[in-house]
UniProtKB/Swiss-Prot annotation:
Pathway per the UniProt entry: Carbohydrate degradation; glycolysis; pyruvate from D-glyceraldehyde 3-phosphate: step 2/5
Sequence positions that bind ATP: 202, 324, 354-357
GO biological process assignments: gluconeogenesis; glycolytic process
Main location: cytoplasm
EC number(s) recorded for this UniProt protein: 2.7.2.3
A Pfam family assignment: PGK
Binding-site residues for substrate, renumbered to this chain: 22-24, 37, 60-63, 119, 152
Reactions performed catalytically: (2R)-3-phosphoglycerate + ATP = (2R)-3-phospho-glyceroyl phosphate + ADP
Alphabetized UniProt keyword annotations: ATP-binding, Cytoplasm, Glycolysis, Kinase, Nucleotide-binding, Transferase
Naturally occurring in which organism (per UniProt): Zymomonas mobilis subsp. mobilis (strain ATCC 31821 / ZM4 / CP4)
Gene Ontology CC terms: cytosol
Protein name in UniProt: Phosphoglycerate kinase
Gene that encodes the chain: pgk
Family, per entry: Belongs to the phosphoglycerate kinase family.
Length: 397
């Protein structure tokens, strides 16, 4: 897809640029506990400020449901944002109206201002064109730098793109280019790892992927449902037995498209789900009635390693086992390290996303070695489902 970036925006000196960022950060009291999202804003905000623009940051924080709520005011993160950006940040306690316009006029070229929480206004989440028109009066240009909110058609993520010349910020650009390389126009063979507890939450992802990838690696609790559909007794493992027919449909679709589905040949089982219980590593055919599958076994990991070695592109969403409890993190860590090594060697483009996935890659210590790790959550999942994202669609040139 073609979209305009900051390279296309032209001279912004003295111009007012409304920039949508994702600043929805976790807090403990008045302390930001994870500033990843604040840091993602640095390239776009500082580039525009250095070019002399008046940078007006729009963002949401929490779920105030269309009502002002001091607990969710963006004033609370102004100082943390200033610290990350390395420059002063003004605060304007509105997103529209005369007082906000006067505050914007008073800013010097190159200044950065954080506007109030967009979700304090009922029209934001309804994508109200009247609110979009009011907010647009504050700006000359609109930049969307928040891929993580791109699956929402809100005023600040979609509506403004129809009221002002619209561009993708640097973080948005980086995300879109990485996703295009992973599934849009990838280098084949393409492998996808899809894990997590339930098939039901990733049905659309699986259906989309069988038509796009050469190898589909199934892990986590959802692998149990796939195994059960093939007649394997999975004991008391987490399993959606009622979805066996649906899974058979996915197998049939994969056969038509030539996509090979990989399921574990051996597994790690325990009788209870807790840290370091007695475990057995066994072929999938040997699971006892009182045992549950909690990780993929070493033979399966070795086979999957060969799949990655033969692939050129990898898309990863979801862990292979119950990685949050040792020792059921071993398969995820081993395969993640292999993917990272192949990426560093230049033989694999690796793109990963989703909350559990990011946590698993950080746990394995390899997130920095993947080609791209998306922190976008819902937007990343909808992209994997093949859905059109309103915030991205609105930026198309």
């Amino acid at each position: 897809m073609a979209f305009r970036t900051l390279d296309d925006i032209g001279d912004v000196k003295g111009k007012r640029v409304l920039v949508r960022e994702d600043l929805n950060v976790p807090m403990d009291g008045d302390r930001v506990t994870d500033d990843t999202r604040l840091r993602a804003a640095i390239p776009t905000v500082n580039e525009l400020a250095e070019k002399g623009a008046k940078v007006l940051i729009l963002a949401h924080f929490g779920r105030p449901k269309g009502q002002p709520n001091p607990e969710m005011s963006l004033a609370r993160i102004k100082d943390a944002l200033a610290g990350v950006l390395g420059r002063p940040v003004h605060f304007i306690n509105d997103i529209k109206g005369e007082a906000a316009a006067k505050a914007v006029d008073a800013l010097n070229p190159g200044a950065v201002a954080l506007l109030e929480n967009t979700r304090f206004y009922a029209g934001e989440e309804k994508n109200d064109p009247a609110l979009a028109a009011e907010v647009a009066k504050l700006g000359d240009f609109y930049v969307n730098d928040a891929f993580s909110a791109a699956h929402r058609a809100h005023v600040s993520t979609e509506g403004l793109a129809h009221k002002l010349p619209a561009f993708a910020g640097r973080a948005m650009q980086k995300e879109l280019e990485a996703l295009e390389a992973a599934l849009g126009k990838p280098t084949h063979p393409v492998a996808a790892v899809v894990g997590g507890a339930k098939v039901s939450t990733k049905l659309d992802v699986l259906t989309n992927l069988v038509s796009k990838v050469d190898h589909l690696i199934i892990g986590g609790g959802m692998a149990n449902t796939f195994l059960a559909a093939q007649g394997v007794d999975v004991g008391k493992s987490l399993c959606e037995h009622e979805l066996k027919d649906t899974v058979k449909g996915i197998f049939a679709a994969a056969e038509k498209t030539g996509c090979k589905i990989h399921l574990p040949s051996d597994v790690v089982v325990a009788k209870e789900f807790k840290a370091n219980p007695p475990i057995r590593t066994i072929p999938v055919s040997d699971v006892a009635a009182d045992e549950m599958i909690l990780d993929v076994g070493p033979k399966a990991v070795a086979a999957l390693t060969e799949v990655l070695k033969a692939s050129k592109t990898l898309v990863w969403n979801g862990p292979l086992g119950a990685f949050e409890i040792e020792p059921f993190d071993k398969a995820t860590v081993a395969l993640a390290k292999e993917a990272a090594a192949l990426t560093k060697a230049g033989s694999l483009i690796s793109v990963a996303g989703g909350g559990d996935t990011v946590a698993a890659l950080n746990h394995a210590g390899v997130a920095k070695d993947f080609s791209f790790v998306s922190t976008a959550g819902g937007a990343f999942l909808e992209w994997m489902e093949g859905k059109e994202l309103p915030g991205v669609k609105a930026l198309e040139a």
